[in-house]
Each structure stands twice: as structure tokens, then as C-alpha cells.
């Protein structure tokens, strides 16, 4: 799959990543290579192969759910760059 500089520009804009114009063409080539590799992976016959989430089959110990106070808001927000009324304040990301 071929990716061009215009597609990279559009994806970068959607992801809010500022990329200089001179980097768009090298990024397009790199992304095209990655997508070609993924297409090769899609050609591998995986019929009959069980899906797995880890290479080691283990089970984690279960614990009882316990209700807690949730912590001291002052301690929780101590390292927050910005807080208001016991909440984290973050920049708006949806227009």
C-alpha cells in the first residue's frame, strides 16, 4: 500500500502532530514500508491457531473487591499541573 505526503499531512493534522513539510515524504515512505509488512503478515495462514494474549499461560490471583475512601484529594492532585474543585484540569481536545 502506497502512502503519499498528502495522506501523511492529513493524518498528522488529525493526530495534532506538527511535522515540517520536508519530513512528510520520508515519513510517507516509512509508513508505506510498515503497511507493506503488515500486508505480508495478513497473508500468513493462521487457520487452526488458537489466539493468545501471552506466551506464558498463567492465571492471576483473585482478590475481593474492597470499598475504600479513594484517597485524599490533596495528595491525589499534588502533582497535577492544574486542578480545580478537586478535579484534574486538562486542555479541551474535542472541537
From Swiss-Prot:
Could you tell me the superkingdom of the organism this chain comes from? Bacteria
Assigned keywords, A-Z: ATP-binding, Ligase, Nucleotide-binding, Protein biosynthesis
Which residues are connected by disulfide bridges in this protein? Answer: none
- Keyword Protein biosynthesis (UniProt): yes
Gene3D superfamilies from the entry? Answer: Glu-tRNAGln amidotransferase C subunit, N-terminal domain
Task: Please give the Gene Ontology molecular function terms for this protein.
Answer: asparaginyl-tRNA synthase (glutamine-hydrolyzing) activity; ATP binding; glutaminyl-tRNA synthase (glutamine-hydrolyzing) activity
- In short, the EC number is 6.3.5.-
Which reactions is this enzyme annotated as catalysing? L-glutamyl-tRNA(Gln) + L-glutamine + ATP + H2O = L-glutaminyl-tRNA(Gln) + L-glutamate + ADP + phosphate + H(+); L-aspartyl-tRNA(Asn) + L-glutamine + ATP + H2O = L-asparaginyl-tRNA(Asn) + L-glutamate + ADP + phosphate + 2 H(+)
Q: Which GO terms describe its biological process?
A: glutaminyl-tRNAGln biosynthesis via transamidation; regulation of translational fidelity; translation
What this chain does, per the entry, is described as: Allows the formation of correctly charged Asn-tRNA(Asn) or Gln-tRNA(Gln) through the transamidation of misacylated Asp-tRNA(Asn) or Glu-tRNA(Gln) in organisms which lack either or both of asparaginyl-tRNA or glutaminyl-tRNA synthetases. The reaction takes place in the presence of glutamine and ATP through an activated phospho-Asp-tRNA(Asn) or phospho-Glu-tRNA(Gln).
Self-association state and partner proteins as the record states:
Heterotrimer of A, B and C subunits.
Family recorded in the similarity comment: Belongs to the GatC family.
Which protein are we looking at? Aspartyl/glutamyl-tRNA(Asn/Gln) amidotransferase subunit C
Q: Which organism is it from?
A: Phenylobacterium zucineum (strain HLK1)
What gene does the UniProt entry assign to this protein? gatC
Amino acid at each position: 500500500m502506497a502512502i503519499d505526503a498528502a495522506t501523511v499531512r492529513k493524518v498528522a493534522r488529525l493526530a495534532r502532530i506538527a511535522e515540517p513539510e520536508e519530513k512528510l515524504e520520508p515519513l510517507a515512505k516509512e509508513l508505506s514500508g510498515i503497511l507493506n509488512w503488515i500486508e505480508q503478515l495478513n497473508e500468513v495462514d493462521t487457520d487452526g491457531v488458537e489466539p493468545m494474549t501471552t506466551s506464558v499461560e498463567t492465571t492471576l490471583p483473585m482478590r475481593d473487591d474492597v470499598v475504600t475512601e479513594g484517597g485524599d484529594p490533596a495528595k491525589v492532585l499534588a502533582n497535577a499541573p492544574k486542578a480545580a474543585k478537586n478535579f484534574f484540569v486538562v486542555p479541551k481536545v474535542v472541537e
